[in-house]
Design a protein with these regions (language model features):
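Acidic, metal/ion-coordinating pockets
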Residues: 5-310
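Short, Lys/Arg-rich N-terminal segment immediately upstream of the first membrane anchor
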Residues: 1-2
Length: 310
């Protein structure tokens, strides 16, 4: 099948992101958000949120679990639905360390999420299981106790309602090894779950942990999965994991954001790992009508600030 490939660069808030257009011939609790029926509604999404290692250490040292969120909370709170990729379990007894690749954060980081107005946490990634199923279960308990929905765990969707529009969220991990309880990017399972949720919601969003770390271009595997997800019935894809910003593709009229970069993490060792974008996606009913990317830049090993441009 022949495809015409068009590359368009557009500037949102001074952030140049490539947008690729392809022309092709071819239950958790439901929480209502009160707004008027015909008004637009906004979905806000972040890059990787990892309240572990130095982020955890500094937060505890500063005795302020809202510290990492101070400069971005007003943006996140402004969304009707705000979704994050939480790439670290939250534990009652998390060891304090500045290094290593076994991630966890103190359970009190939940205060930061609440402060920033987080509604949905996607947990399907390669670090949420660093403390096993027990750590996952503890994290889910803490999140739900504060009214934050979760998805990407035990093949369970999250559903939120705004303007009488039902927005459904699924999440899958395509990195590392399969872990108990974490939703894996098995295409047969994904297709079934997307089609099942499709019948229950008006807007269907899939969050993906995928791709190669520290790369600015989506891999062939990412593109293959992305097109499969859209063809299976999803409306929108939110990607993360590479820790760099990656471009956007519009496929069959649907947006695929391959990676938002880092939002809260301690990777201070390169310019690219300090950068991220907060996506502000405005819908009218079921239709996406505006896309904005707000650039962020991490300072002090974990606190992002908002930039006018990179």
């Amino acid at each position: 099948m022949n495809k015409r490939y068009i590359v368009i660069c557009i500037l949102f808030f001074g952030v140049a992101l490539g947008i690729y257009f392809y022309r092709n011939s071819s239950t958790s609790s439901i929480v209502p958000v009160v707004t008027s029926e015909n008004s637009p509604w906004t979905l806000i999404a972040t890059g990787d949120i990892i309240p572990a290692r130095s982020v955890n250490y500094k937060t505890i040292t500063y005795k302020d679990f809202t510290w990492a969120w101070k400069n971005i909370a007003s943006i996140l709170e402004s969304g009707d639905i705000t979704v994050i990729n939480l790439e670290s379990p939250l534990l009652s007894n998390c060891p304090i360390t500045n290094d290593g690749f076994i991630f966890c954060g103190d359970k009190r980081h939940i205060e930061g999420l609440v402060y920033a107005g987080v509604d949905v946490a996607t947990l399907a990634n390669n670090h949420i299981g660093n403390y096993g199923k027990k750590g996952i279960d503890e994290t889910v308990k803490f999140l739900r106790s504060r009214g934050i929905d979760v998805t990407g765990i035990d093949e369970e969707p999250a559903i939120r309602v705004v303007n009488k529009i039902r927005a459904g969220f699924l999440a899958y991990n395509d990195i590392g090894a399969k872990e108990e309880g974490v939703s894996w990017a098995d295409t047969s399972v994904m297709e079934r779950e997307i089609q099942e949720l499709r019948n229950k919601v008006d807007v269907l969003v899939v969050s993906m942990s995928w791709g190669e770390e520290y790369t600015a271009t989506p891999s062939a595997r990412q593109k293959e999965l992305a097109h499969f997800i859209i063809d299976s019935g999803a409306d929108f894809i939110l990607g993360n994991h590479p820790h760099w910003i990656q471009p956007v593709e519009v496929y069959q009229g649907k947006y695929i954001v391959y990676a938002h970069g880092n939002t809260i993490f301690d990777q201070m060792w390169s310019e690219e790992t300090k950068k991220g974008v907060i996506g502000k996606y405005t819908f009218s009913g079921m239709r996406l009508i505006n896309v904005e990317f707000i650039p962020t830049y991490i300072e002090d090993y974990g606190q992002p600030k908002v930039l006018e441009q990179f």
